[in-house]
Amino acid sequence: MKLLLRALATFVLLNGVDSVADESFQKCNVTGGPHGKEFDDSNATSRGLILRALRLCGVDFVDGIGVTIWDLSVEENAPFHGLDQNCRDVQLSPYEYITSVEFHSAKIDSETRVGFIRLLSQENKTYEIGKMSNRGKEGISECTAPEGYQLAGFYGRSEDKIFALGALWGPLPEKWPLQG
């Protein structure tokens, strides 16, 4: 019975949207390869967060990614992963939040890494970095936030580039303070 429960828990972690330690957060499947060191923004945020900005780094591939979040418990926090070069900072408009992600993986010098990301807000604004995969559906992952959720950060694997990436969804705030 214990073996069956362990196998089921492993399956849930590797497939579909799953809950993290704080049950108010959910994760999408990770896209990419096994290289680099693990990271997880779920420790850098809490319920009621507001996503204020994105930091997207890279040219032909995704070399770095970060978010700036504001929440009631830590005021402002900006977890960042990968290489902080060739970056574009995107300030979200007040009350804007990310509802959908698309990640493409690519194989370079025998390493699988993230080659392209697209983030879509509820205002139909699109934010992208990298180059789209030409491998068809293979290596492409899309995920939409559950109803009442928004992008809260990321998890995956990185060093001087992003090797694997998944979205972390957090609940929308009950009240939106003025953003400025």
Curated annotation (Swiss-Prot):
InterPro entries: Jacalin-like_lectin_dom, Jacalin-like_lectin_dom_sf
Principal location: secreted
Record-annotated Jacalin-type lectin domain positions: 25-171
Record has Signal as a keyword: yes
SUPFAM superfamilies per the UniProt record, alphabetical: Mannose-binding lectins
Signal sequence, renumbered to the chain: 1-19
Residue ranges annotated as motif RxLR-dEER: 52-77
Inducing or repressing factors: Expression is up-regulated at later stages of infection.
Keyword annotations of the record: Host cytoplasm, Host nucleus, Secreted, Signal, Virulence
PROSITE patterns recorded: JACALIN_LECTIN (PS51752)
Cellular compartment(s): Secreted; Host cytoplasm; Host nucleus
UniProt keyword DNA-binding present: no
Pfam families, A to Z: Jacalin
Any one GO CC term of the record: extracellular region
Domain notes per entry: The RxLR-dEER motif acts to carry the protein into the host cell cytoplasm through binding to cell surface phosphatidylinositol-3-phosphate.
Protein family per UniProt: Belongs to the RxLR effector family.
Functional note: Effector that partially suppresses the tobacco programmed cell death induced by cell death-inducing proteins.
Name used for this protein in its record: Secreted RxLR effector protein 19
Source taxonomy: Eukaryota, Sar, Stramenopiles, Oomycota, Peronosporales
